[in-house]
């Protein structure tokens, strides 16, 4: 009983952190790989690639009619926020995530999110690609977001970059659930086609951008330290950490607080 109480106190101290942190990108857009130099441009309006985009757009419309359960997931995925990411990926990860309960994982994902935005903004405004629902003068499954979508260009898919990069990061936090996390990450991008907000090639480019961002972040010492802290937090929260690990982590936190 006494040992359990001590471990509980140590655990609570180990995972505590200050609230309301401001997200800071690991790299600026100039420091990230330039998508214009290595990622294919969006397909023009003739040829097989664009024909496939149209076929996938029609497939998305069919899915909205045939599979209401999958469509409901796609509609949830349409909310562009870190809260949505944590909600949708908590079950695949095997741990409920939130800013309050998992502050280190939150910090990892929060800084990664703004880094992902840095890689996508320039190509979006360079290509100025029109979204499929606009080309066909139709509505998406998420009409409440259409005004914002009309002001923001289509290529690459920012939702897909965030979803796939989050899946890669969380697979590193918990490698044992990598298959499940990556499956959910693939679904997150697919959801953009299902709701009608993106072409398939937007989603494909988004996954490439996410992979490039993920690789670049691994050259940042700050990122590597935050990943270490996130993995440690996961082990503590899921009961995988040894008492020695918890004590060592708590000792380091105390030293950090004194500085």
Residue spans of the language-model regions?
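Hydrophobic alpha-helical bundle signature of multipass membrane enzymes
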Residues: 21-195, 216-222, 226, 232, ...
């Amino acid at each position: 009983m006494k040992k359990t109480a001590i471990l509980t106190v140590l655990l609570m101290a180990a995972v505590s952190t200050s609230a309301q942190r401001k997200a800071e990108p690991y790299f600026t857009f100039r420091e990230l790989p330039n998508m214009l130099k290595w990622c294919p441009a969006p397909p023009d309006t003739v040829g097989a690639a664009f024909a496939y985009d149209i076929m996938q757009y029609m497939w998305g419309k069919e899915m909205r009619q045939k599979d209401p359960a999958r469509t409901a997931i796609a509609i949830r995925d349409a909310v562009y926020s870190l809260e949505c990411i944590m909600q949708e990926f908590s079950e695949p990860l095997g741990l409920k995530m939130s800013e309050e309960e998992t502050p280190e994982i939150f910090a990892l994902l929060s800084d990664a999110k703004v880094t992902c935005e840095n890689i996508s903004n320039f190509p979006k405004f360079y290509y100025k690609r029109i979204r499929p629902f606009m080309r066909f003068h139709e509505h998406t499954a998420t009409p409440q977001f259409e005004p914002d979508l009309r002001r923001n260009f289509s290529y690459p898919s920012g939702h897909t970059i965030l979803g796939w990069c989050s899946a890669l990061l969380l697979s590193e936090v918990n490698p044992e659930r990598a298959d499940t996390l990556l499956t959910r990450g693939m679904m997150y991008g697919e959801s953009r086609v299902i709701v009608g907000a993106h072409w398939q090639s937007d989603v494909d480019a988004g996954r490439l951008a996410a992979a490039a961002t993920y690789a670049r972040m691994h050259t940042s010492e700050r990122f590597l330290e935050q990943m270490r802290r996130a993995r440690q937090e996961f082990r503590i929260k899921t009961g995988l950490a040894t008492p020695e690990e918890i004590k060592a982590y708590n000792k380091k936190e105390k030293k950090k607080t004194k500085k």
